[in-house]
Amino acid sequence: MSDTPQLVVHRDKELMAEAAAARLITKIVDAQASRGSASVVLTGGRNGNGLLAALAGSPARDAIDWSRLDLWWGDERFLPEGDPERNVTQAQQALLDSVPLDPKRVHAMAASDGPYGSDVEAAAAAYAQELATASVPENHAAVPSFDVLLLGVGPDTHVASLFPEHPGVRETERTVIGVHGSPKPPPIRISLTLPAIRAAREVWLLAAGEDKANAVAMALSGAGEIQAPAAGARGRARTLWLLDSAAASQLPRSLYPPASA
């Protein structure tokens, strides 16, 4: 497990999105070259969608073999199919509808009008099973070994739909949970848990804007994961925080080098 996070601080959110997109393209291409395919977990929110939009506008996107890319989601709002607030809907608009993905490798979480109806626990269990099925048998793992797992960081330090002091952040056994009573609307969601997040080779946390500065400082200054879920999001090989200068404004300069982009 990567215990020491790496920080890269960019001048503004636009540069952060462009740089993160370039990093992601390189990571996907390298994974496909070495293992034949790549697996990425997407995140919603303004920073996650900003990254996808930057990727869509990058000429280098054509270096990716989109037919050999598995896409998963870290969380989802449990709303009807096509709802504009669903993360998958926003991802489709930002990027997915413009690239030649294999539909069988786009692993969206169930909608509230899908096969499980309003039963969010059944929908979460089904996604956990889909993850387990996709895992390489010899790894004996409950989830695939994601190449990159993207996470936005909320102003309260939440990641995915794991909120401070909420039951979901305390989950240690299941890989996917139904979230009830989310402090951020809508109240019902589906989320990966911290154990599932930590199965990723690399976890990249994205934060931009002054409203994220306190959360970033708290997560990187020794807070516990129950109080600051972002502090518990770590990759097996690498944990990377991609920030703009506003989000990094409350961090001591000793935490990141002056040469940050």
UniProtKB/Swiss-Prot annotation:
It comes from the Bacteria. GO terms for molecular function: 6-phosphogluconolactonase activity. Signal peptide: none annotated. It catalyses: 6-phospho-D-glucono-1,5-lactone + H2O = 6-phospho-D-gluconate + H(+). GO terms for biological process: carbohydrate metabolic process; pentose-phosphate shunt. It is an enzyme of class 3 (hydrolase). Belongs to the glucosamine/galactosamine-6-phosphate isomerase family. 6-phosphogluconolactonase subfamily. This is 6-phosphogluconolactonase. It comes from Streptomyces coelicolor (strain ATCC BAA-471 / A3(2) / M145). The gene is pgl.
